[in-house]
Amino acid sequence: MEIIPAIDIKDGRCVRLYQGDFAQMTVYADDPVAVARRWQAQGATRIHVVDLDGARTGRPQNVDAVLAITQTVQIPVQLGGGLRREEDVAAALALGVERVIIGTAAIVETELVARLLERFGERIIIGIDARNGMVATDGWTVTSTIAATDLAGQMAALGARRFIYTDISRDGALSGPNFTALAELVKPDGPAIIASGGIANLDHIRQLAQIGVEGVIIGKALYTGAIYLPEAIAIAQTATG
């Protein structure tokens, strides 16, 4: 099981939001590149980057910061936020990003997602961001009438092989992941599931390993010091052999 540190970027700075609320934002660093270097130095094998401005506007905004990260670290970077057009996805991959996360487009443009999966294969991750079990879009500002489990089924039918599941009410709240929802999504021989939102301590990591998720994205707990990355990595490796 892989531990993936998160770097959320707004206006070029590394920040964290509480439950996706832009009005409840904490700035942790002015230089996201320095943060990426720190996580790499502490043993990260992958970094999860979110362009928050892009998520809200629908087009990538922090391109320079993303490029600087991919050019600086020697580990893979996955990127989400505002990637709702084929040309933007292609451009992100051209920046050196290994995988991109498609969220809003999975709801509103199924044909686009089908094309992206056909063109880029496993470099496409479907982001399922849920509020009370229903998928949220547009930087989490709109809650749809589509259940997270239904979207997962639809995307798997199109060929998606990897999902990131985020429970919005837990994101940035350090209240624990939604173990029940994650357990519903993890299936033998099914798409890989990466857990995100609410991870606050090492016991959460042990429980996620038991559920069988492929990876765990950790944000706020790393920035507050609640979790020390090398410890989290060691526990993930021990728990999953």
From Swiss-Prot:
It is an enzyme of class 5 (isomerase). GO terms for molecular function: 1-(5-phosphoribosyl)-5-[(5-phosphoribosylamino)methylideneamino]imidazole-4-carboxamide isomerase activity. It is found in: Cytoplasm. GO terms for biological process: L-histidine biosynthetic process; L-tryptophan biosynthetic process. Keywords: Amino-acid biosynthesis, Cytoplasm, Histidine biosynthesis, Isomerase. InterPro entries: Aldolase_TIM (IPR013785), His_biosynth (IPR006062), HisA_bact_arch (IPR006063), Isoase_HisA-like (IPR044524), Isoase_HisA-like_bact (IPR023016), RibuloseP-bd_barrel (IPR011060). Pathway: Amino-acid biosynthesis; L-histidine biosynthesis; L-histidine from 5-phospho-alpha-D-ribose 1-diphosphate: step 4/9. It catalyses: 1-(5-phospho-beta-D-ribosyl)-5-[(5-phospho-beta-D-ribosylamino)methylideneamino]imidazole-4-carboxamide = 5-[(5-phospho-1-deoxy-D-ribulos-1-ylimino)methylamino]-1-(5-phospho-beta-D-ribosyl)imidazole-4-carboxamide. The keyword Amino-acid biosynthesis applies. Its EC number is 5.3.1.16. The active site is at residues 8, 129. The keyword Amino-acid biosynthesis applies. One of its GO terms (cellular component) is cytoplasm. Belongs to the HisA/HisF family. This is 1-(5-phosphoribosyl)-5-[(5-phosphoribosylamino)methylideneamino] imidazole-4-carboxamide isomerase. The gene is hisA.
